[in-house]
Amino acid sequence: MRTAWVLGIAAALAVGAAAQTPETPSATTPPATTPPQRGPVSSALNYVPGVGDLMHLLVQPRHAKLGLAFQEKNWALAGYAFKELQQALATVGKVQPKWRNLTVAEMIESMTGEPMRDLDEAIQAKNAKQFAQAYEDLTGGCNSCHTALNHGFIVIKTPDVSAFPNQEFKAP
């Protein structure tokens, strides 16, 4: 019985190995082509997020994390969140260069440029008063932009509580 079992496994392994051996194409075999993808996969690959998507997914969480880091006086995390916010804003302008015939990067700079520079200075100096004012100005810039673009119903504010239960904002 044991011999039959061993022979059965050996035969299965041999068949499996033979099945995995690649065939050598002949000179007359046409090359394999991959058909164009259709359906959900190709749609996902061609998806370009809109300005609203990018603001919601990239900018808003980083704005909140920056505020939460400041509330805990975690200057290292505030510096990191600030850089992430800078990159997120730049990404929005790169992914969506135009919105309703407006240059997105220029809009962002005009509404947030000065407060972002002030935030950078405040973080470097660990100046809580300067940070608080610059963060308020940044938040106001966001809301001014929303209003100017007829989206005044989107109101950004300083976070009251964290939406990130798995992240500690207190300095280690």
Please report, for each region that a protein language model flagged, where it lies by residue:
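Bacterial N-terminal signal peptides
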Residues: A4-G16
